[in-house]
Every structure is written in structure tokens, then in C-alpha cells.
Amino acid sequence: MLMLMLVAAVTMWLRPLVTAQLCRSRTVRTGKVFNLIQDVQGDRLYFHPTTTRLIKHPCEKNIALYLGKQVFFTMDNFETSLLPFTIPTSMQVGVPEVTSAHFAGSLLLLVVDQKVYIYDYENNSWSMSLGIKHPVTHVSGDNCCYTGSLFCVHVSNLVFAYFRGDQISQTYIYYSNTGGFSFWKYHYDRQAEIIGSLGGIFHFFSLSQVAMLVVNQGKGMFKYSDHPLNRSFGLSFDYNGTLDILIAPGQRGILLLWFENSLLFSHNAGQLVDTVRVKKGDQTLFSSIFEAKITIHNIAVTENELAVITREDNLYYGNLGIVPSSIIKFADQYIWSEDVALMFRSPGTLEILTPLRDTAFPAFDFQKCLVNIQALLMDPELHVGKCKIEFLTGEFIYRMYTIDMHSQLELTASLIPQPGTSLIPLVMVSNPHSLGFQATFYENGYTSDGNTKYKLDIFLKQQQHWGRTDSNFTSSLKKATMSTLTVDIANKEISCVDIKPLSTLISVGCDLDKKIVIQNKVSACSMGILDPLTLQDNYSFIIEKEFYDPGFQGQQSSEDLHVFYSYQQLGCPLLVYYDTLWKPVVELWRKDSFQEVIDAEYVLLEVNGQFSYSYSLTAQSAMCTSQPQNWTTMIKEFGGPFFWNRENYVSCHDPNNNAPLRWPDVQYQILGGRTANQIIFGHNGFYVFYISIVDPYYSYCQLETIFSIYVYGAFPVQLVSAGVVILLIISSILGSVWLAYKTPKLLRTARGRRIKKCATQLCRRCKTVCQFRASATARAGTEPPGRHRTPHGGRSDH
């Protein structure tokens, strides 16, 4: 009996010792020696649920928000004592209860008392979101952490605001593309027909879909917005409580759905949702959290890891991969309290955070317990297998790529297994509806200690261009999408904490490095017609009122237009002869490298409203099967010029275009593509053109630019109309014929003979005068200079 008591005492003494070695606790207490921290000012925020939340900024690793009985905001990972987070009383929030929070770039969005408030932590300022007219309880969004990408800025700025639990057919949903500053009503397709309550609405960028969680009769399922997933719901799953949905960072499509008695996992943005299993080694102990009778208090999620702390004072850990997710239980530890929360500091390093109230100061201290996951996994009682991966890397990690229309991408990864083991690599794309790939895995030499090195070559392009999928599977080719590429190892052991999956974000959309340039081999300056120095010296020209319309409708203006020529923007104009059918040679450039001559469809518009040019083809001669678009109709439809682009262009050769061909003789104003349409000029002078590539299948970019030409060689404009000129010519001919007929008859009369006699005498006199002047000129040429005979025989000096 004495021996048993001694063993029990030793066991109880060793247990906290082991716990201390695995989880080293320390208390953060700062700013209290000299009482530097001020009192709490404003309305103190709080979070009502019995569980806690700790939201880390996905990109700024030191910024986080703690939600519990008190709310704390930190910019240094809780390394200083903090006052409870408050909102200024001037905001007049009413009940300062926080129901949802989200980081949108450098902004913190908080739903307080069913309204959305914005805290700009960089400028320490508060504001209220505009445009929300109805109560909301939650906000949702995502963050993209690739720096220097406009696409990432767009991702971070998109936010939804909604009332969770409302009937979908009657609820109001709001969206923002300004990071939460302004919201607009969001109209989900056929929303009024959806039966069920709203569990949330999210923009899954990994799938390029807006997804709505529909809850009905104890089942949840995601409904998607766009083809091809909008034809049906995702697979249903048990919805036994109000689930919080966490989108794992990295845009890989990983979701965690949880409440106190349930933990669900999806690796494809909600299309398939499964329970998280509880395992010990390779053995599955429980198929779900509910079956294991676990009560979750808080969870922490990164791109690849998951940690769970329960009210039963247990800590669980798992990794997030393509296989069904599972967690393992670590040794029992005294770590739980009603205020405890979890957060990952780095891969394999977990921090257990507990706010500590100070009776003497208003600022709270923080107890931090740092857990080394790798050390815990080495416990032989966990039966965790040894990691079989020695090395896994790729040059594409931490980078973002773009695949434009008809483009392709090649990436490589390197892999070295542990000696005596073999591995199977997994290559996955989060959006197979828009991005396809082909991978090759092969040996690539040996390491210095004899291990085999392997290389993985991945060739990617748009799924539609592989030619091996049905149109019912692929997304719309006209729509820009995105996908995440992930390289991982099949059946990877949970002990591979430091071997993270290789992941990169691929935008199937506009390559921002692309631009169009108009070929200008023969310019007005190189041919000597215009002087570049003159063009640079505030040069201007006049467009006569007969040849331009400021409204771009082809109507004459009331006054001439004085135009300044921007040489810095336009350079020397391209030279065009008026009597030649013409169209520009459009070149595609990427950065400073020429790519190709563009043969896609495009449109031109003279930016000053000139209309003294026409097109060589009509709708009929261009073989249109439907009425073609033109600048007149597009300007009327969109309220101004320069809005004709790939987004609104509809080809008159498209068999799906049902617009009847009512006016076949109208000018066909689209150049390039399948037609030989060209431009005809009838007037000399400067033309400054706006060009836009409208072919939706050439590039996802809005390729546009302006350029100038100089037309020469046209005849001067007639001041008298052609009808008047023709009338005068005909009158002259008729008058000549009449005189030829009438004159002979007139000469036979007495009056005619007198006229004839006078004319004869006049001719003789003119002949005599001419002979005299000719002889005088001849004599003057034979005498010495300065002297000639006078008519009277004398001499005259000059």
C-alpha cells in the first residue's frame, strides 16, 4: 500500500514537469512599472459566444484580434500588456457586441450591433461603412498575400456583409469592392427561389465562384454562382449547430466548418465536406468530433496545419492535405480556461494564449505557452510514423503567375526521399474547370550520400485548350479565373511538420505586362512632310466644322475645333496616302519584347469626333448573319465613347447572336479578324485614333491605345457643289452649239456684211501695227548700245 501511494505521488509530481517541458509558459507584462498605460476610453467591445476566437492577419503575421469576454487588438503578437479594445463613443454603436470580424488589407472590419465599422489600424481611425440599409451579423472575405500584385489588392478588397440565419429568399446581402468602405446590394441569381436559411456567403477565389451556404432541415450545402457549378448544389452534410466557416490562408480552397460539437473539412471549397477524424498513429479512433464526445473551445488554422483545444483540457493537432483530414490527441495538459485561445507563430510552433486580468491596472497581461509540435510528435506513445521526405522544393513558391489566353506555363519541383523509401508526388489545381496540367516525374541524379533525386515537370495551360474535357465541365473561356497549384506527397506522415506543400497562385487572366503598339515604319517626319521639332513646339491644327462632331454621331459641328498635338504621347504621325485602302498594323508587346502581329478583331474611333473617313465593307459584304454593332449604337447604349471592348463585343458572325440583319448596307466598323475590312480617307490632315481589341478570345486584357496618322494627297475641298459645276459645263456646250449654228446665217444678211467688213479692217490695222513694231525692234538690236535712230532721222543718247 505504501509503495502504491509512493508511485502515485511520483506520477503526480512528474506530470506537471513533463507538461512544463512541452509547453513553456511565460507572462507578458509591460508598461506597468511607471503606470504608463492610460485608462480605457470609449465603449468596451465584447464577444458573446461561450467560445473564444483569435483572428490572425493572413499576411501581417504580428497583427491579430482576440475575441472573448474582452476584445484585444495587437500589432506585436500580444508581446505587450493591452487595454481592452474599444470603439469611440462618438460612433454611437448602442450595444458594443462584436458578432464578426475580418481583416481586409490594412483595415479591420467589425460587425457591432448589426452594423459594419472600419478600424484603420495604420492611421488609428474609425469610420462606419456606407450603403448598408438593413441589419447584418457577419462579414466574409479573403486576403491575398502576394506583394506587388493588383489582383491581390482586388481579392483583399472584396467583402460580403449578411445576416446569418435569415431566410435566403428574403434576406439582404451586401458586397463591397472597396475593402468595406462602401457596400452595394448583391443580387444572387434566383435568390428568391432558394429554400433554406443563410449560413454564409463567400467568394472562393480558389474556385472563382461566389458560394452561398444553404441550411435546410438539418443539412447544409453550398450553392455556386457560375458555370459549370451553378447547375446543382454541392454534396450535403450534417448541419447540427451554427457553424463558423474558416477559409484557410493561401487560396487553396481549404475550409474548416466548426462549432462546439462538430468539426468539418473541405479541400475543394465546399464541393465535398467531410468530418475530421480522430486518430492515433494510423488507427482511426473516431470518425467525427461528435462521436469522440469532444467539446471544442477554440481552433487555429494555417495554410497546412490545424490545432484544436477542448474544454476537456486536451490539445489536438493535424495537417491539412488532400486526404481526409484527421487530428491526433497530445498528452493531457493543464492548459484550458474559458479565456484560452490558440494561434500558430510559425510552422510547427503553436502558442496557447490566455488574457490575465490585473486588479491594480486596467491593462491585461497575457500568459503565453509555446508548444513545439515536432517535439510532441516524437512521443512514442503517439505512434507517429517517421517522415519519409528529406527534401521538397520548387522555384515557384511565394510567387504568383499569370496565364493569359492561349498562353502556357512550365514549372518544376525537386524531391529527395529518405534512404530506402519511395514517394508518390501529388499535383493538384484548385480550379480544374479553368486550369489543366500535365506532369512528368523522373529521376534526376543522386545526392552526395547516394540518395536518388527526382524532378517533377509541370506543364499548365487553360483547361479548354487541352481538348480532353467536355464543355459542361469547363468554365466560360471568356471569363478570367484563378487557380492554385499545389504539389504535395501522397500519404504524407503527420510528422513532416517542416515539409510544407509547395503552392503558388495562378491567375488565368490578364497579363498586365502586355500592351499593343501601332507599327510606324513610314512616318510623316521620316518622309520630310512634317518636322518633329515643329510638332514638339506646342503644335496645333484646325479641324473644320464640316468634318467633326463632338458627340461622335456624324453630325456637323457649329464651329471649327482647335486641337493641340501631344507629341510626347503620340510621337510623329504615321503617313497615309488618301487614295489607299488602309488599316493599322497592330503589334503585341510584352514589356519590351515583341510577341506577334495581332490579327484579332478591333475597332477604331477618332478621338476628336472626325468622321471624314469610311469603311470598305458593309454588313452584307462582311458576311454578317446578324446586325453588327457600331459606334453609334454603342455610344448610345453606354452613354459615351471608348466603352466598346471585349466585355460587351458581340460578333455578327456568332451563330448564337439572334439580332436580325435589318440594315445590310450599314458600314461594318470592325477591323481585323476574318474580314478584309479597311478604312477609306477623303480628307487631308491629322487623325488621332483610339484602338481597342474587342475579340474576347484573344486576351483577357483590355488592350487599347491611341495613335496618330497624317493623311496627304487628297484634292482640295470643292467650294461649289458638283451639281452646279455640271450645270455650267452643259450650259457652255449648248451655247457653243447654238453659236456654231447661228453665225453663218447672220453673215448672209446686210448687217452681217457690215460686221464682217469692220472685222476685216480691224485685222488689217492690227497687222500693220505689229509689222512696224517688229521692224523697229530688229533695227534697235544692230546699233551700238545706248544709241539708236529716232523716227525723224536724228540720234538720241540714253
Swiss-Prot record:
Residues 1-20 form the signal peptide. GO terms for cellular component: CatSper complex; plasma membrane; sperm principal piece. The chain crosses the membrane at residues 724-745. It is a single-pass type I membrane protein. Disulfide bonds join 23-369, 59-145, 144-152, 387-496, 510-701, 525-572, 624-652. Glycans are attached at residues 123, 230, 240, 472, 538, 630. It is found in: Cell projection, Cilium, Flagellum membrane. Residues 746-798 are cytoplasmic. Residues 21-723 are extracellular. One of its GO terms (biological process) is spermatogenesis. Coiled coil: none annotated. Keywords: Cell membrane, Cell projection, Cilium, Developmental protein, Differentiation, Disulfide bond, Flagellum, Glycoprotein, Membrane, Signal, Spermatogenesis, Transmembrane, Transmembrane helix. InterPro entries: CATSPERD/E, CATSPERD/E_C, CATSPERD_b-prop, Ig-like_CATSPERD. Component of the CatSper complex or CatSpermasome composed of the core pore-forming members CATSPER1, CATSPER2, CATSPER3 and CATSPER4 as well as auxiliary members CATSPERB, CATSPERG, CATSPERD, CATSPERE, CATSPERZ, C2CD6/CATSPERT, TMEM249, TMEM262 and EFCAB9. HSPA1 may be an additional auxiliary complex member. The core complex members CATSPER1, CATSPER2, CATSPER3 and CATSPER4 form a heterotetrameric channel. Auxiliary component of the CatSper complex, a complex involved in sperm cell hyperactivation. Sperm cell hyperactivation is needed for sperm motility which is essential late in the preparation of sperm for fertilization. Required for CATSPER1 stability before intraflagellar transport and/or incorporation of the CatSper complex channel into the flagellar membrane. Belongs to the CATSPERD family. This is Cation channel sperm-associated auxiliary subunit delta. It comes from Homo sapiens (Human). The lineage of its organism: Eukaryota, Metazoa, Chordata, Craniata, Vertebrata.
